[in-house]
Amino acid sequence: MSNTFEESLKSMSLDYLNLLINGQAFSDVTFSVEGRLVHAHRCILAARSLFFRKFFCESDPSQPGAEPANQTGSGARAAAVGGVIPVNSVGYEVFLLLLQFLYSGQVSIVPHKHEPRSNCGDRGCWHTHCTAAVDLSLDILAAARYFGVEQLALLTQKHLTSMVEKASIEDVMKVLIASRKQDMHQLWTTCSYLIAKSGLPQEILAKHLPIELVAKIEELRLKSSMPLRSLMPHHHDLTSTLDLEDQKIRRMRRALDSSDVELVKLMVMGEGLNLDESLALIYAVENCSREVVKALLELGAADVNYPAGPTGKTALHIAAEMVSPDMVAVLLDHHADPNVQTVDGITPLDILRTLTSDFLFKGAIPGLTHIEPNKLRLCLELVQSAALVISREEGNNNSNDNNTMIYPRMKDEHTSGSSLDSRLVYLNLGATNRDIGDDNSNQREGMNLHHHHHDPSTMYHHHHHHF
């Protein structure tokens, strides 16, 4: 009897979902999201979401139970006259996932495995706990709260709670901030514990978290007797040692900001300042000029390939993310490794190729509009050339016959791919977005992928406007 009941519910869920997949079939409301039309049904949306119920009532005061409209924006007016309702508060992918949950009561909030994402440089990633997966879940959480779909919000919180156990500490910090904003106590507890356990000093935490959250993390550490920094040997001297280190780091950064590399040199020689542990090179790449970075490297006290933080990014990873040819060039001149990998196996070349792919096939995406195509092309060529030189040197230095047969093939393949990438970048960077095509088929295609593969398959671009 129970199985029959479950099958009946599943069948009904699929029937409702097919209404959404088929787009215009019996549709009586149309939304415009990121230039694409989404066809839906008022009765289902109103029954499942308090937000939509109020929205449709405000747009049609003659409806039974309609409440007086406090605000009648362009969306409400469009709904009243049967026009297209613009949606600017969420992206197309997240909006479709939200509707999928409203229609069927089920949704997969994990990106499609191996799908290229703008915020994941690993082409073979399964997107189970990477930055792309975390960002999508956070966007769904915000959308669920905005549209009053509490069941989806709770489902997403549960998913994030299990995800952060394997996520990078930077992503855990993002989730912590969101859990505080969305008042998700369980998620807050999990994230704050993970960050406290990480041992990152206040100086690093303050770069990613509001000061009041840093204070709460420190309070949790004191209550739990967690070490503030694993490199500090004496438990009873943690506070004083941290204060001294923080003072050194602040002085060093002020010196770098004023291009006073000589003062940094004196701090290294006289005060024992560790440029790697203080992330001096990372800070200089992010905030200073090429000349300062060059002078800092020429001191000989900083490891150009030092893996910083829990993610293991090097200065070259940061320069690649910034799309700064000047920084990329000066780092490569001082023997930065273009093949060095983060904890997640991502190289600087992976980052640049992912950014290039976004420009080639999707146009300048939101959040990356500051990137100049020519600079991206130059960065890619510089890093590719450096990787090719290393590949050739390894091939020439290898005396094994088998290896000498293998290396040229790798080199040729790499050269071909690099050349093709460069030509495509040169010809196509900065191209406009692809034609949108038929909106109804887009909706059907997007929903079919979610329905059959149980995960999203369209790129989501971050927006922060209002519905």
Curated annotation (Swiss-Prot):
Residues 434-467 are annotated as: Disordered. Pathway: Protein modification; protein ubiquitination. InterPro entries: Ankyrin_rpt, Ankyrin_rpt-contain_sf, BTB/POZ_dom, NPR5/6, NPR_central_dom, SKP1/BTB/POZ_sf. The keyword Manganese does not apply. Residues 27-111 form the BTB domain. SMART domains: ANK (SM00248), BTB (SM00225). Keywords: ANK repeat, Cytoplasm, Metal-binding, Nucleus, Repeat, Ubl conjugation pathway, Zinc, Zinc-finger. Disruption phenotype: Defects in rosette leaf development. bop1 and bop2 double mutant displays leafy petioles, loss of floral organ abscission, and asymmetric flowers subtended by a bract. One of its GO terms (cellular component) is cytoplasm. It is found in: Cytoplasm; Nucleus. The keyword Cell cycle does not apply. Belongs to the plant 'ANKYRIN-BTB/POZ' family. 'NOOT-BOP-COCH-like' (NBCL) subfamily. Homodimer or heterodimer with BOP2. Interacts with PAN. May act as a substrate-specific adapter of an E3 ubiquitin-protein ligase complex (CUL3-RBX1-BTB) which mediates the ubiquitination and subsequent proteasomal degradation of target proteins. Acts redundantly with BOP2. BOP1/2 promote leaf and floral meristem fate and determinacy in a pathway targeting AP1 and AGL24. BOP1/2 act as transcriptional co-regulators through direct interaction with TGA factors, including PAN, a direct regulator of AP1. This is Regulatory protein NPR6.
